[in-house]
C-alpha cells in the first residue's frame, strides 16, 4: 500500500540514485540517497506481492543491465548484474498477483523484448517478438481488487 520513486536524471549531465518513499496516504517523503549506480530511463515493476525491482537503464557509461531489488520496507539493495538484453526506456508492471514483467525499450534501436520476473525477483531471459518494437511507453497492472 506504499510506493517509491528512485534513480533518475536531476540535471542533463548527472545520474542519481536518489529515492523518495510514498506513504499509504500519498505523501512523498524528501530525498534520501539510495543504493546502487545512478541511472535514468530504467524500468521497474512490482513482484512478490509487496516488493519491487528497478532494472536496466542508462548511466554515464551507456545502457546497463543492472538490477536493484526493493524490499517491502522500501530498502533498495545493491547492484546485481542483470540478465537479458541491455536496454533503456521500456517499462514494467505486476501481473498474476505476485510476478512482474518488464518489456520493450531501446538498445539504440527500439526492441520488442520482454522479461518475466518471478515472485522472488529473478529476471528471466529474453522473450522476443512481443508486439511492435517501441520505447517510452507506459504500463500498469489491472484487474486487482482492493
Predicted features and spans:
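Polar, enzyme-active/binding microenvironments
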Residues: 1-146
Amino acid at each position: 500500500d506504499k510506493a517509491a520513486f528512485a534513480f533518475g536524471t536531476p540535471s542533463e549531465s548527472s545520474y542519481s540514485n536518489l529515492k523518495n518513499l510514498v506513504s499509504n496516504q500519498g505523501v512523498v517523503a524528501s530525498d534520501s540517497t539510495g543504493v546502487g549506480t545512478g541511472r535514468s530511463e530504467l524500468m521497474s515493476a512490482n513482484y512478490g506481492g509487496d516488493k519491487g525491482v528497478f532494472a536496466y537503464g542508462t548511466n554515464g557509461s551507456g545502457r546497463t543491465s543492472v538490477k536493484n531489488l526493493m524490499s517491502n520496507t522500501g530498502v533498495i539493495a545493491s547492484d546485481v548484474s542483470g540478465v537479458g538484453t541491455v536496454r533503456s526506456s521500456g517499462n514494467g508492471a505486476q501481473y498474476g498477483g505476485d510476478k512482474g514483467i518488464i518489456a520493450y525499450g531501446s538498445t539504440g534501436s527500439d526492441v520488442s523484448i520482454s522479461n518475466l520476473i518471478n515472485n522472488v525477483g529473478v529476471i528471466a531471459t529474453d522473450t522476443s517478438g512481443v508486439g511492435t518494437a517501441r520505447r517510452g511507453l507506459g504500463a500498469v497492472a489491472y484487474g486487482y481488487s482492493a
